[in-house]
Curated annotation (Swiss-Prot):
One of its GO terms (biological process) is lipid A biosynthetic process. This is Tetraacyldisaccharide 4'-kinase. Belongs to the LpxK family. The gene is lpxK. GO terms for molecular function: ATP binding; tetraacyldisaccharide 4'-kinase activity. Keywords: ATP-binding, Kinase, Lipid A biosynthesis, Lipid biosynthesis, Lipid metabolism, Nucleotide-binding, Transferase.
């Protein structure tokens, strides 16, 4: 097991052997210091010591307390579709993490044309603009400034703040917190001893808690009196890049596939493909938000010897599109959020709009 894999098992509460206990003890002091700093930061915003900026449109924030994947991107896409179905012009504000323009404030898509590549803007805003036709996306480390740019040039009716739970500088009218249904708080400790970006008490800032990756049954009782609902994820198909139609994953059964993913928990993606009955002869995990340069492409070419196709996530697909001529046929999967009890979410949206 890699060091990263061991740490993730420790931080999620899955690893509790002697080595895990020793490492946990070593990390306890920096975790306590980190927790104190982020608690004081949140307190400064709550008490008005740090300035909170307001945009002249409703802002819906989607975020989490833990590092790693809780399904933020599928949730943002789901919300965007629901809002657009209500006739709203929707703009997503994203940081642009991993793109060459990270730190700049730029429009990624005006709802008609995607003007920046994934290499420039990062994978998530480009993937969202690609998968939700008509969605406007902007990037900026300062989300307030990015929102002002969108107001000036795009005139949206509502904003979705992607990964915004800790971006306290921007006021939000609806604060949605996503939590993994199976391990909502990991081992309950802050970084680097656990998965938490903030202490558990930060749950109180949420207006709605959505438990993700639920398969049925009751959700954990982490949310207290805060309204909550459950949601699951489903791979609903795959599209041949660059612009093929989405087809059922069953169409790939009987062929030999190589899977790759540069996401927080790639093994979950690989397992989902196998559950769909796909013959995955090699599964290659890359770093989260991998850039897919020469090294990654060479790795894929070597692994694909004797295979029929490559298959990856939607976020990875927007980056692999630049290398299609050098690879086997590449399929990008479609991952959808499916609320199991959507009434609390719809009620929360009604209050904002």
């Amino acid at each position: 097991m890699s060091c990263t894999g061991f740490w993730r098992k420790l931080a999620s509460g899955e690893e509790c052997g002697a080595a895990a206990r020793l490492l946990g003890a070593v990390l306890a002091i920096p975790a306590a210091l980190y927790g104190l700093v982020v608690r004081l930061r949140a307190l400064a915003y709550a008490r008005g010591l740090s300035t909170v900026r307001h945009l002249d449109r409703p802002v819906i924030s989607v975020g989490n307390l833990t590092v790693g994947g809780t399904g933020k991107t599928p949730m943002v896409a789901y919300l965007a579709r629901r809002l657009m179905a209500r006739g709203k012009r929707v703009a997503v504000i994203s940081r642009g993490y991993g793109g060459s323009l990270e730190g700049e404030t730029r429009i990624v898509s005006d709802g008609r044309t995607i003007v920046l590549s994934a290499a420039e803007a990062g994978d998530e805003p480009v993937h969202l603009a690609t998968s939700v036709p008509g969605l406007m996306t902007v990037i900026g480390t300062d989300r307030y400034t990015a929102g002002l740019l969108a107001l000036e040039q795009l005139d949206p009716d509502v904003f979705i703040l992607d990964d915004g739970y800790q971006h306290l500088r921007l006021h939000r009218d609806l604060n949605i917190l996503l939590m993994d249904c199976n391990r909502p708080l990991g081992n309950g400790r802050t970084l680097p001893a656990g998965l938490l970006r903030e202490p558990q008490t930060a749950v109180r800032r949420a207006d709605l808690v959505v438990y993700t990756r639920c398969t049925g049954g009751k959700a954990p009782a982490v949310h207290g009196m805060i309204p909550s609902c459950r949601a699951g994820h489903a791979l609903t198909g795959a599209a041949l890049l660059p612009d093929g139609e989405v087809q059922p994953l069953a169409a790939l059964r009987g062929l030999r596939g190589v899977a790759c993913a540069g996401i927080a928990e790639p093994e979950g993606f690989f397992d989902a493909l196998r559950r769909e009955g796909l013959d995955i002869v090699a599964a290659i995990p890359f770093a989260d938000h991998a850039s897919y340069g020469e090294r990654e492409v060479s790795t894929l070419r070597e692994a694909a010897a004797g295979a029929d196709y490559l298959i990856t996530t939607g976020k990875d697909g927007v980056k692999l599109s630049a290398h299609l001529a050098r690879l086997l046929p590449v399929y990008a999967t479609v991952l959808e959020m499916r609320p199991l009890d959507p009434a609390p979410l719809e009620a929360a949206l009604d209050k904002v709009l």
